[in-house]
Regions:
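Cleavable N-terminal export/targeting peptides
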Residues: 1-16
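Short intrinsically disordered, low-complexity coil segments enriched in acidic
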Residues: 2-3, 269-271
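Outer membrane beta-barrel
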Residues: 16-156, 160-196, 269
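Surface-exposed beta-loop-beta
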Residues: 166-266
Length: 271
């Protein structure tokens, strides 16, 4: 199978700023258009074009150190909550609370607006996770970034029981070389989670081709189901190299699931 992809991104913003500079408000929005053509393909997947993601949101900065953001998204024929959080920043230190991605995985940390590759990697899609409600501490300087957070493992629509489980995630990023023309970025991360009753009974990892053209149901080429889970660890490492317009990105993620009455599961992905 060979897949030819293209991506068109449309971004719009509107700003309002106070004369004293202590208040700033902006509306944000974007739409991602994806197209794909499959050839030399034995699976007979269809060609097509889709609007893969639409976002509409607003963000505000106030009282010098406070920022807030609310964003909704439309994808797969439904509206969903995206980033909804408040941050307090003082110098290199920041506290963050709300609904957002935990500190895990390179593409999830960047978000679709800042993807350097055309789509999210298969590794991130399989071993990453969705946004969760939680809080975190972040230290960010020119040379290093460290972060740690505690998150609920439940869904924001609260359709499941209240025994949701939890996630603890931490990450360290070092930039030994960083200027306008050169960057060396080295990151490591760890994540521990305990889950609700339904996920303890069965959890799955699945992935497909790196494209938004196919529906989620048909774009599954690898699937692993694990039963009788006790808890789960995930580990990650990533590297970014940049030199005068040349960009290289690589990442390795691994998941280890401890099971009751069965062999533990370990899965890995790299690109």
């Amino acid at each position: 199978m060979f897949l030819l992809l293209f991506l068109l991104q449309i971004i719009a913003q509107a700003f309002v700023k106070s004369s004293t500079g202590d208040f700033e408000w902006k509306m944000t929005g974007r739409a991602l258009f994806d197209g794909g053509i499959f050839f030399s393909d034995s699976s007979r997947l269809g060609n097509g074009m889709v609007i893969s993601d639409v976002r509409l949101g607003t963000s505000v900065r106030f009282l010098k150190n406070w920022e807030g953001k609310i964003e909704l998204g439309y994808r797969d024929s439904k509206v969903s909550l995206k980033d909804i959080y408040v941050t307090y920043r003082r110098g290199d230190h920041m506290l963050k609370v709300g609904h957002y991605f935990e500190h895990w995985g390179l593409d999830y940390r960047l978000g679709s607006l800042r993807f350097r590759l055309m789509t999210m990697s298969v590794t991130d899609a399989v071993f990453g996770d969705k946004r969760k409600v939680g809080f975190s501490y972040i230290y960010n300087s020119r040379a290093i970034t460290t972060s740690a957070g505690f998150f609920s493992d439940g869904d924001t629509d609260n359709i499941k029981s209240l025994d949701e489980g939890y996630v603890i995630a931490a990450q360290f990023i070092g930039r030994p070389l960083y200027d306008e023309e050169k960057l060396v970025h080295l990151g490591i991360g760890v994540r521990y989670s305990e889950h609700d009753k339904a996920e303890r009974e069965e959890i799955s990892f699945k992935g497909g081709a790196p494209t938004e053209v196919l529906s989620k149901n048909e774009n599954v080429f690898v699937r692993t189901r694990i039963t009788n889970m006790i808890n789960q660890w995930r580990f990650g490492a990533d590297v970014i190299l940049f030199y005068r317009g040349t960009y290289l990105q690589s990442e390795c993620l691994a998941a280890h699931v401890n099971r009751a009455g069965g062999e533990n599961y370990t899965g890995k992905g790299v690109y």
